[in-house]
Amino acid sequence: MARRAKKMASNSGDSSPEPGIKEINETWKGAIACLGVALLFLMTIGVLYWQVVEKPDTNWVLRGQVSGLVWDKKSLSFSFKSLSQDKTFARIDARHLPVRGGALLNNHCWFNTTRFCHTWDGVANLQVTLDTPNQSVAECYRVEWTPLNCQVALQDCFSMVNTSWYGGGSMRLQYWPINNANINSQPFVISDLQDTPTGYGSVLERYFLGSTGVAVRVHQEVPLHVGIESRKQLCLGIPPNAEMQPLRYTICVSDSLRSAHQQFGTVIPVVQPDQPDTSILRLPHWRSQRVADIALKLEHNLKTFTRKLKLHRLGEGIMDLGEQSTLLLSNEVDETLQSQNRYRGLRQLRLSITLSPFTSIDSHHFQTTLQEGRENLWLGLPSAANGSQGPLLMKWKGKFAVKLNISNEEAQDWFIEQVHSLQRRLEVDYVNLEVGVGSPYVGQAQHHSCRLCGDDYINQFALLAEKLGNGTTVSAATRTAHLPVFVRMVPRQSDWSHAGLKGLIPSILHYSLLGYSFFIPDVIGGSLTDGFLADEELFVRWMQIATFLPVMSFSTPPWVFGETWIVNVTRSCIHRHQTFVVPLLMKYAAEWTSLGHPVFRPLWWVSPSDPNTFTINDEFLIGDEVLVAPVTESGKVHRDIYLPGNSFQWKDMNTAQVFEGGTLLREYPVALTEVAVFIRQKSKYTPAIAEIQQATT
């Protein structure tokens, strides 16, 4: 028994596990389970945190080779950025999108890497198409917003933060850049700034350029409205309309604003254009303020004025006749053949005549066309009685008149013959055409044709002006920068404000950027004044700028101030214009016709990566070689002057001092009888400029 008990005890000990193994296994299992639960908990918390706190507000919706389009759901805005996101070309707020419900966007144009599509239900469809121009490292995007409701007002607003904007329409208060302007959103059409001072003036293009290297061009068929919120946003839009017309524009990005403008802002026609008649540049233009009610009195006034020019040794000039004086001579010449001999002395003068597409209903021309049954020469409306066309009456300079039917080839031929006939009879070469502004059918509810909507009349009238010869000047222009005609600048106030002298250089740069380098500036001292200009300092400072423009125009003769020194300064400015400036303009006119480069250039043209040049509005370049820095502040004989281009050297024409580019000259002395002019040294044009300088001495 004892031995069996001992054996059983021995067997029992052999079958039991090793001490602690079971406890250890259970501990590891519990630890692993706890760790898994903890990881799952942390992952859940992480996902929830990402969803609530860290989820990104932006996403790429379209990518090109050098740039792309980014959507920001928080601000409801799009940004065109470089792929590295170190540069923002443009930030656009889509104001028509709903304020709530912002989310990251998905591309509804499936599997299309060059197009982005998205729909905001009940609001608008968006389609953005990437387009890389041939032989270009830059990229363009065609943007199209289509409203889904006739109550939707489409509006894209481009931020002005860290971006200077240029282009668009001329303004009464002209700024360079346009960031400081403040204009309510309104139809983007040419208007008379005297009647509508907050509108857009005589030169206008649907083109905007940003200092970040971005160019925007709105498609022509868009019924565009443009507004500028000072230093905040430039807004392009379409008001609600029954047709639900889309907002279409193309935005292009490049490495600098100059390259963006050269690639996308310059429109070079297939056929190289002729230059305007540059003979008009050499002689100053004079406008007599004496009123005449008969042709003989007008002739007497002109001859008297011409004798005074010779008396003060101011040389020859072109006498600008207004429309009233032109019609006075035209009617007199028509009335009698004896006028061929009577006004022989008048024909010995150099005259510029002024005409318009308007004809008074009391005039012989209008009555004759009615008698001949040629009512179709004039714009008309269908008659309610029999459906035939009746001439459309409108006001022109206080009188009832009719307007040339520019869409009728017969009317165009008739007008051209009338102008050429008058030129032959008066023996004049230069014609100034006042076109009027706005659509002639505004306010005519029964007229549904859009042949002459917006600025179509102005555009077609400029095409007609080209047929009259390249000595023709038009009072307004759009989409015709390639034509060999001159464009007259808007009238300016006779003061030192941005509506007066301070707005002159911004206007020069604005016209040139849009392609209109051959312009006729307003008269020295401004034409929006009664009688002669009384401020002699304003007259001199204004004349110093005009010396470097295509034409010097006067309505206040220098002798009225009774100061010999003013006459002497005038004589000196005219001489400098004829011997130094005009040859320069001729040189750079060749670049305009072949490359589309502006003749008058902002400082950033030679230093596009220098932000100091983006906002300089009181200096300008002629070509790449001559920098003009006039005084535009009353009572000042010193001014700050910035010389662009770190690798350039600039020589003062007055003192022969040479300065390094990239330098700010503080309080640089500029006497009342002087204007600061600098010549770029060691450039390809330096020898030619030296020859011009030598010829002036």
Curated annotation (Swiss-Prot):
InterPro entries: Alpha-glycosidase_related (IPR050985), Glyco_hydro_31_C (IPR048395), Glyco_hydro_31_TIM (IPR000322), Glyco_hydro_b (IPR013780), Glycoside_hydrolase_SF (IPR017853). Its main location: membrane. Keywords: Disulfide bond, Glycoprotein, Membrane, Transmembrane, Transmembrane helix. One of its GO terms (cellular component) is membrane. Glycans are attached at residues 112, 134, 162, 386, 405, 470, 568. Pfam families: Glyco_hydro_31_2nd, Glyco_hydro_31_3rd. It comes from the Eukaryota. The chain crosses the membrane at residues 30-50, 503-521, 542-562. The keyword Glycoprotein applies. Electroplax tissue, brain (200-fold less), and heart (500-fold less). It is a multi-pass membrane protein. Binds 4-acetamido-4'-isothiocyanostilbene-2,2'-dis ulphonic acid (SITS), an inhibitor of a variety of anion transport proteins. Homodimer; disulfide-linked. This is SITS-binding protein. It comes from Tetronarce californica (Pacific electric ray). The lineage of its organism: Eukaryota, Metazoa, Chordata, Craniata, Vertebrata.
